């Protein structure tokens, strides 16, 4: 009996690698651990959610509340938020204000549509009546960069954006997540950069959102002033005729040892972005895409004059993220880079919405964090279940 048992174990041990080789690649990918949690290094902090591996993952939505918990007298928190309907960050920011922190909010009119949003607006004003704490924009706060009409569901203050000065640390923070309940069940990310220069750029943008004007203190911003550069970091704010994501894609090329382009955007509707991704695929890059709608997946899989992205590398999952992780040549030099922020690749996100995007070049650690997040979502995504082909209107 013992001999037969040993033989069985031996045979199974020899067969295991062969059985693994026969398993579908996507099944093996899905067995990997999810990317959930926060990491920090060198003045940069990132947080990610992985709802399929951690039910109702609170990581990204909980991080702002934990930050608010550290604020007190002499600190300032500026928040620009599209949607806000959950209680924990509401409690945390109101408590920070009671402790003496200055809290300023720019919200979309959507905040008035739910209990927590109304409570937030009313209480922020009541607790600090000496100043105007809250600005609510009907539509985008800043002027459009096209004549219109704006696309459906656009012309909004679409930001998930924080500019904080807490304990002497000045930070610029952006996230893909609104402070709303459904975001617990979607892939999201959060990026905090401690940098006084970037922080000041964020303050200057925020004051224009408050004023609902490009002109503040006698200085009018053009599209050129809507971009900040410091070292390997670039920030861009919108509405803007120029696009940080598109310009980045145009400056990419691939070699045998640097050829990975991984993009996760909840929505991709712009033909110029699709063309660049197809061009990179045709030129030898391994382009992988995750989106949130199978109709968008179908549109991305279409063969184009610019190139053709293999259907198997375009997948759908429940994501709200906006991120690009690249290991390729950027302006002729092999590097690692990340682009992330609040904007989907839509005409509204470019021309009609208030948005913010960041690009960080040459930070291999940060690239590795975002790539692991992308790989998590890609492994648990699926091929589209509908063959409906949407019509994406050109930007105007």
Predicted feature residues:
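Secretory targeting and sorting signals
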Residues: 1-29
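Short, well-ordered loop/turn and helix-capping segments at boundaries between secondary-structure elements
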Residues: 20, 24, 362, 366, ...
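HKD-type phospholipase D/PLD-like phosphodiesterase module
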Residues: 31-75, 83-254, 290-337, 341-363, ...
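Short, glycine-rich nucleotide/cofactor-binding loops
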Residues: 79-85, 265-269
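Beta-propeller domains
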Residues: 230-285
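Terminal interaction modules at protein C-ends
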Residues: 258-274, 286-299, 368-371, 375, ...
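Hydrophobic alpha-helix feature that most strongly marks membrane-spanning transmembrane helices
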Residues: 282, 328, 343, 375, ...
